A protein has these predicted regions:
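A short beta-strand micro-motif common to beta-rich folds, especially ectodomain repeats
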Residues: 3, 9-22
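Short, surface-exposed beta-strand/loop "edge" segments at domain boundaries and coil↔beta transitions
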Residues: 9-10, 25-26, 102-108
Length: 178
């Protein structure tokens, strides 16, 4: 069957019912077609904040490539809770994405360590629903917070094409790129 594009400004829902009468088995699946959204480029995401601050999204999405394996240690600075206690959750909930062209990158913070499922080279579509983009200055860097595993749709797993550049092509904007 074909599903028509959602051209209205509201969500559409449907319930699909499956039944295997011979076995007495049935199931229901509720499907939601979301409000049409905008696809952002990395340059457009960065342009939303011209100085330190935050931008909250209602929807929308962008494409990216994961530059690290989720769940690895040393993904971020783990804060000291006391003289003998470290919060390792900071690294466990951090990963990094770059644009498909390799020009810009950003840090992502997912809700839990279990949500940090991306692998290096995964090409993904990232839903920005309920996400917050944070810009910090000195150095200028961007973090996307409020994501869960459900925000990522993997288009190709672990085999995104490498982007080659020389040292002369790398500048201050290349923070969080591979």
């Amino acid at each position: 069957f074909n599903v028509a594009a959602n051209e209205i400004k509201s969500e559409r829902t449907a319930t699909i019912k499956f039944e295997l009468a011979e076995k007495g088995v049935s199931a229901e699946l509720k499907v939601t077609q979301i409000i049409p959204t905008k696809q952002y480029s990395f340059a457009e995401l960065r342009a939303l904040l011209t100085s330190a601050g935050e931008y909250k999204f209602d929807g929308d999405w962008f494409e990216a490539v994961a530059v690290a394996d989720g769940g690895k240690e040393n993904m971020d600075t783990d804060p000291m809770l006391s003289a003998s206690s470290i919060d390792y959750n900071e690294s466990a909930t951090t990963n990094y994405l770059q644009g498909v062209d390799g020009k810009y990158g950003l840090r992502i913070k997912v809700a839990t360590a279990a949500d940090n499922t991306l692998k290096r080279g995964d090409k993904v579509k990232v839903s920005l629903t309920d996400a917050t983009l944070v810009r910090e200055d000195n150095p200028v860097r961007y973090t996307l917070k409020g994501l869960t595993a459900n925000c990522f749709t993997i288009e190709s797993s672990g085999n995104a094409a490498s982007v080659s550049r020389t040292v002369s092509q790398i500048g201050d904007d290349d923070i969080y790129t591979l």
